[in-house]
Amino acid sequence: MKFTVAKKAIALTGAVAMLGSVAACGSDTASGKPAQDKDVTEITVWAWEPTLTQVAKDFTKKTGIKVDLKNVGTNTKEYTQLDNAIEAGSGAPDVAQVEYYAIPQYAIKGNLLDITDKTSGYSDFYTPGPWASVQFAGKVYGLPMDSGPMAFFYNKEVFDKAGVDAEQIKTWDQYYDAAKKIHALGDNYYITSDTGDAGFFDSMTWLAGAKPFQTSSDGSEVTVNLTEDKGVKTFTDFWQKLLDEGLVDTKTAGWSEDWFKGMVDGTIASLFTGAWMPANLANSAADGAGKWRVTQMPTADGSTTNSENGG
């Protein structure tokens, strides 16, 4: 299926239900209107989530529509290519997996397909948070693929070698103590890495109880104060201590081959991230199979975990 219009609307998600509804997500070359289902023989999907390979096969078997599934990179790597394709007026996919935070930026520019009328009743399939995250200005632009309650993933082989029981790490002070023991295994061993991800900062400050955002009563103004929030300071003090003492890898780029290699060989021994991570470990750090475990996130004071990351 070919498109000749300057821009085409993109539906953003990775869920199989959405794939079923984008049979009309292409553009009619004459009118620029969505093509009819009967015209569609192939759709292009950009996604990095490995389980979608089987979803695409099942979709083709069900509908007869071929799915050209491409992994063009994760996060900003994909978004850069997406932006370039949209600007060029060609090469953009029909469906793209993106994180929830990216939906508004594309919706504002008119790059997304409004699928509100195609998703009536779908909200019952999802919890309120993820469902609200695919909406902007009262319109639905995708279907949730997952949500990201935070979890503590760790390489048990490395933790055992360092004499650390990850299941007993309940506070950030205990995590700091574990970081020192793991780094003692060798100069290239780190309890985790710092990839400079702003989403990680948001999640960890949230976990520390931060509320640096204030909204006016009419919702027209938002004030952000990161310098005086107690939760922000709690996290930044903790994390800065790890950085100052060289206990965190700051040189390996997140989601790179070296990053996943570190998870396989144990030099990056744990991750604080969303509960969606297992599929990525299985796909990109397969040689580490059997070494990794997951447990509850430690918190500043050992209280209940209440944060999320990505999705």
Stretches with model-predicted labels:
Residues M1-I43, K61:
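Short, low-complexity disordered leader/linker segments with a strong preference
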Residues D58-Y126, K161-G163, G262, G266-S270:
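Extracytoplasmic "Venus flytrap"/periplasmic binding protein-like
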Residues Y141-M145, M150, Y176-V224, G231, ...:
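Extracytoplasmic/periplasmic solute-binding protein
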Residues D237, D244-V248, S284-G311:
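Extracytoplasmic/periplasmic substrate-recognition and gating elements
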Residues N84, A92-D94, S123-F159, Y190, ...:
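A structural signal for short loop-to-beta-strand junctions that line the ligand-binding cleft
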Residues D177-K180, E221-T252:
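Glycine-centered hinge/linker elements that transmit conformational signals in sensory
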Residues Y100-P149, M204-W206, K291:
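Hinge/lid segment of periplasmic solute-binding proteins
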Residues D37-P50, I65-K70, D94-V95, Y141:
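Short, well-ordered beta-strand elements
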